[in-house]
């Protein structure tokens, strides 16, 4: 019995060490969004009209640290505030992220978003995703 207990405790300790040593994201819910915390990086996933929208953020102190395709954002989660430079894979919140990345996806997007260039997209190109994202976030 004592041997089994010792083995169980040793296994749990090893399991805990292995779990903590993995570079696995810890998930936290803030409002209706899930934030996945990675080292110096936050991946934010949300669902809108059945499509998955991804937003990739990194820590920043000032807006001048953000690149041209990034948006400076100050987010509150619980009692803590975070300042971030973020970019998205959807130009206007309507596309589903399919396409070849160089053209206009399915014929109705302009294909000029940085992530569309990398991964493709079929947004309709008539609005900025960030405006819709911020409006949706604060209107609810």
UniProtKB/Swiss-Prot annotation:
Residues 1-25 form the signal peptide. Its main location: secreted. Disulfide bonds: none annotated. GO terms for cellular component: extracellular region. Keywords: Disulfide bond, Extracellular matrix, Secreted, Signal. The keyword Signal applies. Component of conchiolin, the organic matrix of nacre. Only expressed in the dorsal region of the mantle. The keyword Signal applies. It is found in: Secreted, Extracellular space, Extracellular matrix. Belongs to the N16 matrix protein family. Heterooligomer; disulfide-linked. Pif97, Pif80, N16 and other proteins form a complex. May be specifically involved in the formation of the nacreous layer. This is N14 matrix protein.
